[in-house]
A protein has these predicted regions:
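Short acidic-aromatic low-complexity motifs
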Residues: 15-19, 142-171
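Hydrophobic pocket/interface hotspot
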Residues: 21, 31, 49, 63, ...
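A beta-strand edge to alpha-helix "cap/lid" segment located at domain peripheries
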Residues: 82-134, 198-269
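A solvent-exposed, acidic/Ser-Thr-rich amphipathic alpha-helical stretch
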Residues: 18, 37-52, 59-61, 67, ...
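Short beta-strand segments that buttress and anchor functional surface loops
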Residues: 49-54, 74-79, 221-229
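Amphipathic alpha-helical segments
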Residues: 15-34, 169
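Glycine-centered tight beta-turn/hairpin loop motif at sheet-sheet or coil-to-beta transitions
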Residues: 5, 54-56, 230-232
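Short acidic N-proximal helix/loop "leader" segments that mark the beginning
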Residues: 1-9, 139
Length: 269
């Protein structure tokens, strides 16, 4: 929101816990990851703030207040003569609030001159918070992402029903759903039954991962290949999933790569 006579305000829900997000204000390497390589923030009252832009412009200010995992306030403006918003002349407050699905980040930029167009500041802060969200959400998932994808693939290959249920319980959130061109199931029970049917129909084919999984704003993408007993690749594709804060999938959607002479779904049964 940008009121010509008031502060600039931006809100964004990030798929990460407040403690994860707050590290991007207190750790120098993490701060530079979302604010730019030459950016510096000393996260103590009176600490220095410096943000360098690719154009050569530099923003500067001082930290005013810090509440761990919840709030940080700093002054803001631009270095150099003749700046409409001189360094340290305005104030930015950022509040982190835990919400379902992660953290709501509320940014308020106040003290801008009355004649200063707010649109550029609004666009700039939206861009910055998007970079923060990308980095923070990826870090939230990083410790468990490979394991969750591994459990998903292992569940499709597991012949023992009890063990299959255990694997799905680790990688699928309660009520999680799965969709692909021939499948629409809701919950671990339906998915386990579907996997059992696929195993019977495919005669020993196995699901293998292709490449490293990727995360973006709480979404996950990972490739797969269906491999026959003789190691022939029968099909390939990509799954896209939404993960909760523990890395379990709320939903998974599978996309198949084109294959010549692929049978229509009705011919597969």
């Amino acid at each position: 929101m940008a009121d010509p006579g008031g502060p600039v305000e931006v809100r964004l829900v990030i798929a990460a816990r407040p403690g994860t997000i707050f590290r991007y204000f207190t750790d120098p390497a993490r701060f530079a990851r979302w604010m730019g390589e030459s950016s510096v923030l000393d996260p103590e009252p009176g600490g220095r703030l410096r943000v360098g832009y690719p154009t050569g412009q530099v923003a500067g200010g001082r930290v005013v207040a810090v509440e761990p995992d919840r709030r940080i306030v700093f002054t803001w403006g631009y270095e150099g003569d003749g700046q409409a918003v001189p360094a340290g002349s305005s104030t930015v407050e950022i509040i982190l609030e835990p919400v379902a699905g992660g953290t709501e980040v509320r940014l308020r930029h106040a003290g801008l001159p009355s004649g200063e167009p707010p649109a550029a500041h609004l666009a700039g802060w939206r861009h910055a918070l998007a970079a923060l969200a990308y980095a923070g959400s990826a870090e939230q998932l990083a410790p468990v992402l490979g394991e969750r994808v591994g459990d998903w693939l292992a569940a499709w290959n597991e012949p023992d029903a009890v063990r299959r249920d255990e694997l799905l319980g680790r990688c699928l959130a309660d009520g999680g759903r799965f969709r692909d061109p021939t499948t629409a199931v809701d919950g671990a029970r339906q998915l386990a039954e579907h996997i059992g049917m696929v195993q019977r129909l495919t005669g020993g084919a196995r699901l293998a991962g292709r490449g490293a999984p990727e995360a973006c704003h709480g979404l996950v993408r990972f490739g797969w290949a269906a491999v026959g007993p003789d190691q022939t690749v029968l099909a390939t594709g990509t799954n896209v999933a939404e993960a909760d804060l523990d890395g379990r999938f709320r939903w998974v959607t599978g996309f198949w790569d084109p294959l010549p002479h692929r049978p229509e779904p009705a011919e597969r049964f």
